[in-house]
């Protein structure tokens, strides 16, 4: 009896539904509404300082489509993202403006910067600070840790700024390939993913590498040479060459010579001038002479 009554109810309901569908007029307006994001003062500042002069999108809200789901991550903090956007513009984008010209920056600097809250950790005791994708995007991790590193140029470079120069070098290399002779300088001693093991973690200078990560492969090596060179003073570099010894320093110098020639010949960028400009601007960040929170629009 209960089953019968249930069937009657379903039949009646179905009939009612069919009847109502045939009589109702469907609206042409979609019921799926895109999420409306309220414009913040930061968004307006980004429009004037990133989008309008450079056509660069600085994404600070969590974007599921842009996030690598192989790693745990969280959204960037609003105030930390404001500071990071100021730092990137002042120390990186405007440094290239000054040395290479604003048209260079407009044409080649990636059109998307995506900032997330946490660094990405691998199971080999390493972490990802940033990545470059397709010559168009730089992914910046660890935004919410920024305040911990603002008091030190070394920390700021290690966790943020060196990464940007490293990834930008990848983008330049994707646009105009570097001399393949570079990969042969230490071609037999690259370690692939073993660069992070105890074998790769020490003695890399004497083997002709400026960092442990340089040992991964040629394209990472050349990006490390450029990014390390322009974010450290000459005294630091000279000390590393002394530590590398005659053989290691000779190999690193050969790599630096190719980088210097590549940047000047292909991009008309003097890497010594670029280094001076970057370091000057980084010092201004550390000594507080540049506001990292000002969202006023001129």
Go through the PLM ranges and name each one.
Residues 4-5, 21-100, 105, 249-298:
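Acidic/polar, low-complexity intrinsically disordered N-terminal segments immediately downstream
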Residues 5-13:
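Sec-dependent N-terminal signal peptides
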Residues 16-20:
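C-terminal motif of bacterial Sec signal peptides marking the signal peptidase cleavage site
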Residues 26, 82-139:
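Auxiliary, metal-adjacent structural segments of Zn-dependent hydrolase domains
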Residues 70-78, 147-159, 208-216, 245:
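Second-shell loop/turn segments in exported
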Residues 96-114, 175-176, 236-246, 271-277:
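Surface-exposed patches in mature extracellular/periplasmic domains of secreted proteins
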Residues 154, 158-179, 223:
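Active-site recognition of the HExxH zinc-binding catalytic motif
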Residues 190-274, 281-298:
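Metalloprotease/metallohydrolase-associated module, dominated by Zn2+-dependent proteases
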């Amino acid at each position: 009896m209960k089953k019968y009554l249930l069937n009657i109810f379903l039949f009646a309901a179905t009939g009612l539904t069919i009847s109502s569908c045939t009589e109702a007029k469907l609206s042409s307006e979609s019921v799926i509404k895109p999420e409306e994001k309220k414009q913040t003062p930061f968004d307006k500042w980004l429009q004037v300082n990133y989008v309008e002069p450079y056509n660069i999108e600085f994404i600070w809200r969590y974007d599921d489509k842009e996030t690598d789901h192989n790693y745990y991550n969280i959204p960037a903090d609003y105030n930390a993202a404001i500071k990071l956007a100021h730092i990137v513009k002042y120390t990186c984008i405007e440094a290239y403006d000054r040395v290479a010209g604003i048209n260079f920056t407009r044409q080649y600097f990636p059109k998307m910067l995506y900032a997330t809250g946490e660094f990405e950790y691998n199971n080999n005791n390493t972490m990802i600070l940033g990545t470059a994708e397709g010559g168009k995007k730089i992914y910046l991790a660890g935004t919410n840790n920024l305040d911990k590193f603002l008091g030190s140029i070394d920390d700021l470079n290690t966790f943020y700024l060196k990464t940007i120069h490293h990834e930008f070098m990848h983008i330049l290399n994707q646009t105009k390939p570097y001399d393949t002779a570079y990969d042969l300088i230490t071609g037999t001693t690259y370690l692939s993913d073993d660069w992070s093991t105890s074998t790769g973690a020490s003695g890399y200078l004497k083997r002709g590498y400026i960092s442990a990560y340089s040992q991964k492969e040629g394209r990472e090596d050349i990006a490390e040479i450029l990014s390390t060179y322009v974010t450290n003073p000459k005294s630091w570099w000279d000390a590393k060459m002394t530590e590398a010894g005659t053989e290691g320093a000779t190999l690193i110098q050969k790599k630096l010579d190719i980088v210097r020639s590549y940047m000047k010949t292909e991009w008309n960028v003097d890497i010594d001038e670029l280094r001076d400009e970057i370091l000057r601007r980084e010092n201004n960040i550390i000594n507080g002479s540049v506001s990292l929170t000002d969202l006023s629009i001129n």
